[in-house]
């Protein structure tokens, strides 16, 4: 599973667990991106922090491991380089690349897109409220792609960062160890005023 993981959250972990069970995978390898070219328009936390948060978040699951293949490679991170490196390291393995269906819809904009499907099968995880464009879906080779419906956890890394920057809790959105890591290193300093638009007129029942 490739991703920026800035930060990693329970949505990532549930998706990985569901796909592992669906395909009876021996392991799920989490691959934090080094320098994500798609996100050059915003600040991204240092790769080492994102790697360590991923290690913390996945430590309890014996089928989860974390790779440094992308963060130890210099230059922008491209999926084609990730898969070539993993294929060289694991020549006998059948590789499945797990990503969100929104990212999958853009796959033909990725570097050396045609070669990607020769290196791995792709698993597109559905997200709450997201419908993949039929035209985009029609361009993807169905024998190399599987769409998997994931239990609806409406969590995103963007929301976790913004909550932290507003001084709001991220408990139960990210693993406990990641909450403590964020606090220790103050990765997302408070810069946004608290959200005062919430309806607090009724007590929770």
From Swiss-Prot:
Under the heading HAMAP family, the entry gives: NaMN_adenylyltr
Gene of this entry = nadD
Similarity comment? Belongs to the NadD family.
Q: Which UniProt keywords apply?
A: ATP-binding, NAD, Nucleotide-binding, Nucleotidyltransferase, Pyridine nucleotide biosynthesis, Transferase
What Pfam families does UniProt report for this protein, alphabetically? CTP_transf_like
Q: What does this protein do?
A: Catalyzes the reversible adenylation of nicotinate mononucleotide (NaMN) to nicotinic acid adenine dinucleotide (NaAD).
Q: What is its EC number?
A: 2.7.7.18
| Protein name in UniProt | Probable nicotinate-nucleotide adenylyltransferase
Report the domain of life of the source organism: Bacteria
Query: What are the transmembrane regions?
Result: none
Q: What class of enzyme is it?
A: transferase
